[in-house]
UniProtKB/Swiss-Prot annotation:
The lineage of its organism: Bacteria, Pseudomonadati, Pseudomonadota, Gammaproteobacteria, Pasteurellales. Residues 214-375 form the TrmE-type G domain. K(+) binds at residues 224, 243, 245, 248. The keyword Hydrolase applies. This is tRNA modification GTPase MnmE. It comes from Haemophilus influenzae (strain ATCC 51907 / DSM 11121 / KW20 / Rd). Binds 1 potassium ion per subunit. Exhibits a very high intrinsic GTPase hydrolysis rate. Involved in the addition of a carboxymethylaminomethyl (cmnm) group at the wobble position (U34) of certain tRNAs, forming tRNA-cmnm(5)s(2)U34. InterPro entries: G_TrmE (IPR031168), GTP-bd (IPR006073), GTP-bd_TrmE_N (IPR018948), GTPase_MnmE (IPR004520), MnmE_dom2 (IPR027368), MnmE_helical (IPR025867), P-loop_NTPase (IPR027417), Small_GTP-bd (IPR005225).
Length: 452
């Protein structure tokens, strides 16, 4: 017999309304014990919530959803009372006294919904993403995922792969036919079509990943180059202390901002130089750690100081120490001191923005550059949120499609192509949970809120 679980569905703390959710075959037993009756399915009933001795603990709305017409696909009882934490704890304690009832694990209600085919894995993850959304655009995209937009695109890809895989395996199973199915062009055309179809989904998923997770941008450079001033300009507030004293910033400062809906984690770091004391040395060490973990570096140069703005010196002192794959944007700051105009150009293979963090002249140029460099498109009509595991699965599927194309066009190897298509199908199915390990499911749902 399946277990019956209970948890508080509203956030802990004081509030106007507090909700307890019960799911499982004993939900009606809980209703009888607490309410004295089971409400009619999908009908709100205003009733007292009673303790074991008949004492009224609270009173409020009771809702009963009969299996399979509920969020979890099981019998569900919701008790909506007053939001005082003590009241909710007393009611929860009473329910847990009933034989066969236990406290739900984090995300267990959503896990039950997934296991009972009420929603797939991508939709279940969208619930957590909707709760954690930090912008209006993220909310809209999470709702798209919850409504099955992402899953629909993935399932269409899976259907295309299954069709092609069936065709390829049929050509292998009937080698005596006069028609050479592998050479008639149909398989290659279909395969290239799937590759293009997958690229479209990958592009949208990358947008969705940026929207969900944000991008980590580290501001680095010599002391007194204006790094903290730029952080304040981008954040729109005095987030960092700014003085004319070199080395004012000793530790890492973090700000979460949005540029036209694109979330960015902006990180201000200590000035990079030979440290003059132990505290500054620790700050510089932390700065390099942040730099190594960044999605993009903003390298600040002081345009009023010819020596510090010398690109050849910057290349040897700083750029040569970075991983070759790490994107860098060079910012020439303090143009207000020499009368320059804000501009964007390319020098030495790097995009260069000339601006004044003090007057904010050119800061909007940097904002637009970051948005473009990150590949973010404002609006994202019809977009969906995506997680890192989704991108990994799509990337692996794309890799095996390309391998399959080589097996077909260069080696005429139908058996090897069929195996690559099987792997593609497996990776895509991981996204929606059709083929997913129990360990992965545990990791995903354990990150959810209790009561979700």
């Amino acid at each position: 017999m399946k277990e019956t679980i209970v948890a508080q569905a509203t956030a802990p703390g004081r509030g106007g309304i507090g909700i307890l959710r019960v799911s499982g075959p004993l939900a009606t037993k809980v209703a009888q014990a607490i309410l004295g009756k089971c409400p009619k399915p999908r009908m709100a009933d205003y009733l007292p919530f009673k303790d074991a001795d008949g004492t009224i603990l609270d009173q409020g709305i009771a809702l009963y959803f009969k299996s399979p017409n509920s969020f979890t696909g099981e019998d569900v009882l919701e008790l909506q009372g007053h939001g005082g934490q003590v009241v909710l704890d007393l009611l929860l304690k009473r329910i847990l006294q009933i034989d066969g009832i236990r406290l739900a694990r984090p995300g267990e209600f959503s896990e039950q919904a997934f296991l009972n085919d009420k929603l797939d894995l991508a939709q279940a993850e969208a619930i957590a993403d909707l709760i954690d959304a930090t912008s209006e655009q993220a909310v809209r995209s999470a709702l798209k995922s919850l409504q099955g937009e992402f899953s629909k695109k993935v399932n269409e890809l899976v259907d295309s792969v299954i069709y092609l895989r069936t065709y390829v395996e049929a050509s292998i199973d009937f080698p005596d036919e006069e028609i050479d199915f592998l050479a008639d062009g149909k398989i290659e055309a279909n395969l290239r079509g799937i590759i293009n179809q997958l690229e479209d989904v990958r592009s949208e998923a990358k947008q969705g990943s940026i929207l969900r997770e944000g991008m980590k941008v580290v501001i680095a450079g010599r002391p007194n180059a204006g790094k903290s001033s730029l952080l304040n300009a981008l954040a729109g507030r005095e987030a960092a202390i700014v003085t004319d004293i070199a080395g004012t910033t000793r530790d890492v400062l973090r700000e979460h901002i949005h540029i036209d809906g694109m979330p960015l984690h902006i990180i201000d770091t200590a000035g990079l130089r030979d440290a003059i004391d132990e505290v500054e040395r620790i700050g510089i060490s932390r700065a390099w750690t942040e730099i190594e973990q960044a999605d993009r570096i903003i390298l600040m140069l002081d345009s009023s100081d010819p020596e510090s703005a010398d690109l050849s010196k910057v290349r040897s002192e700083f750029l040569a120490k970075l991983p070759s794959t790490l994107p860098v944007t060079i910012v020439r700051n303090k143009i207000d001191l020499n009368g320059e105009q804000a501009s964007e150009s390319e020098q030495g293979g790097y995009q260069m923005i000339s601006l004044s963090a003090q007057t904010h002249d050119g800061v909007q140029l940097l904002r637009e550059h970051l948005k473009q460099a990150m590949g973010f498109q404002t609006g994202m009509e019809g977009g969906f949120l995506a997680r890192r595991r989704h991108l990994d699965a799509l990337d692996k599927a794309a890799e095996h499609l390309q391998i399959g194309l080589v097996q077909l066009t260069e080696f005429h190897a139908g058996e090897l192509l069929a195996e690559e298509l099987r792997l593609v199908q497996s990776y895509l199915s991981e996204i929606t949970g059709q083929f997913t390990s129990d360990d992965l499911l545990g990791n995903i749902f354990s990150s959810f809120c209790i009561g979700k």
